[in-house]
Amino acid sequence: MYPANQSFLVLGLSRSGRAAAEFLLSKNAEVYLYDDMETERVEKELDRLSAQGGKRVDKEALAQMPEKCDVLVLSPGIPIDHPLAVAFRRNRRAVIGESELAARFIRCPIIAVTGTNGKTTTVSMLAEVLQKSGFQVQACGNIGTPLIEYCDMPTESFAVAEISSFQLETLNSLCPHIAVILNVTEDHLNRHYNMENYIFLKAKLLKNLTESEYAVLNYDDKTVRAFAEKTKAKIVYFSVRERIKGAYYENGNLYYLDEKILSVAELPSEGLHNVQNALAVIAAAKLVGVSSKDIAKALSSFKGIKHRIEKVATVDGVTYIDDSKGTNVDATIKAVETMKTDTVLLLGGKNKGYDYGTLFAALNVSKVKHAVLYGENRYALLKAARECSFDSVTLCDEFSFAVRIAAMRAEVGQTVLLSPASASFDQFASYEERGDKFAEIVATLAKEKEENREAAEPEEDTDETTDEGMDESIGEQLDERKDETAELFSNDGIFDSRTEETE
């Protein structure tokens, strides 16, 4: 591909769209720009890229682009069956994404990581292991910084790239030195329509691998294990269930080819899913040539990532955990499994096409004692809860209100867990924004409680605002919402009778 000889339409000016446009402009390509979000941020980006030589396209001119442009660069948030993408393909024009563009130009070897859950943690962990072992490395891709920004990295360095199913829709040229597939469970069915399509996309990461490359696969996941038949690459498995030729977990220790790397007690994050992530990292790091000592040292000091089972605060004996990155059922179940105390769970957001019955079946045998259902999909969650006889729930629409309800319901020694099993896009721009809002509300609650205590100290007879007063105010609002919801759902015990006055 010679960008200077071609014209491109960049559709969508998200992080990857902006990066793709900047790269193409730096190569003297003819670049057209369009984003249908008429926000201040988009306008600033259009102005900035136009100053570099980009050409703004208005909505009326879009229909001409499939004939005018050679290539459509599609942002990951825009599906491959978007009408404009369909029109480009009908005109025998290429439809690619930023990651595909990067794959055609990047010089350094890539370690690519995909899977339904654990991608960001694994990429961050692996990048840290390599960096602390003396390698020049960049964590990139879906984790935040677009892969295209590292096309000029020297050949002796590594790009550790998180690759999502959205990116795989338009990714055809990537041939990573090591491809890691962590797991495949139900996700993004509102985008990919069915599991067959989703599985096909995950397997695409392996399609260009030769006998010179490696595929690190989860032996315990039958779908992922079967991918071994779809590639020519050398296979290295990891497992938490069986002693295999690869990375495995046995009797509280993590091994690679029968050599102990470290004990599970040395891992800073709890949960079997984190053991799986660490095993995948061990396998990939060993293939690069990192010593067992360096791997163990880096893994034991890894601090984790934001919004993934992250402790926010403890307020009046209640612990608040941010797992806003838990955007699907499997991720939420894994987060719940790590809870050591009785838990109030915050669920809800934008539906991604899940069967929530699996979730509530798991909650019935977990530490979760109450669930606050909020957001766009709250009624779908409520329906699944009823069908699974999970009756201790509260229903509301707004996220901020839901967090306060959860705080009110939690008792000393319990945990409030935000792990929504849903996308954030009904009320937020991203799961990061949702998690930050959660932390902000918790901080506000802590401040309010402290102010109430201070106000109560000088005079015992003052007409003060207490925690109980705040609870009563919330309770009055809950009563109104309960009456509204009860009209839709008959009195079958869906509301917890223990808190009748506050719901």
How should each PLM-predicted stretch be described?
Residues 30-37, 215-219, 346-347, 367-376:
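Short internal beta-strands
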Residues 59-60, 96-100, 232-249, 296-300, ...:
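Beta-strand->loop->alpha-helix junctions that form or flank phosphate-binding loops
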Residues 31-35, 138-139, 160, 237, ...:
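Short beta-strand "acidic-cap" motif of Rossmann-like dinucleotide-binding folds
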Residues 7, 25-26, 63-69, 76-219, ...:
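Phosphate-binding loop of NTP-binding sites
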Residues 2-7, 17-27, 264-368:
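Nucleotide phosphate-binding/pyrophosphate-handling subdomain across enzymes
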Residues 45-48, 357-414:
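C-terminal helical cap/extension that packs against the catalytic core
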